[in-house]
């Protein structure tokens, strides 16, 4: 039994969902024992930048916004563990970048911030 996310239906509310998810992620960053204060502030700033960049997405890209928020959440939750799973971090960082690439033509800032977040987690063995 694993965590599976299936997307179907009307995503007009996805904008609210990604904002809520990323707000929770930003709050969770403070609980990362594997990062020092400066690193946590850097990551919190990147999460805020991602949230702002996602707001520029057209309504029909709400599903992608939600995926990006959840991938970021997965990265932070894994990094909060005493012994983060490097494979999980790498796969999640790759997924974050891949999702961002799908909207790079309409929101290039999203891809730039997603890459920075993935690079941040590379120092923990992911990406």
PLM region descriptions:
Residues 1-8, 22-102, 119-127:
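Short amphipathic alpha-helical segments that predominantly mediate membrane engagement
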Residues 104, 108-111, 115:
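Amphipathic alpha-helical hairpins/coiled-coils and adjacent low-complexity
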């Amino acid at each position: 039994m694993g965590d599976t996310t299936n997307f179907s239906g009307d995503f007009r509310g996805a904008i609210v969902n990604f904002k809520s998810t990323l707000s929770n992620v930003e709050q969770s960053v403070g609980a990362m024992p594997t990062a020092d204060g400066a690193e946590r502030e850097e990551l919190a700033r990147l999460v805020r930048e991602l949230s702002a960049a996602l707001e520029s997405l057209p309504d029909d890209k709400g599903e992608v916004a939600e995926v990006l928020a959840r991938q970021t959440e997965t990265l932070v939750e894994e990094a909060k563990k005493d012994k983060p799973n490097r494979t999980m971090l790498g796969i999640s960082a790759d997924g974050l970048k891949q999702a961002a690439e799908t909207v790079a033509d309409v929101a290039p800032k999203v891809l730039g911030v997603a890459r920075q977040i993935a690079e941040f987690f590379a120092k923990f063995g992911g990406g």
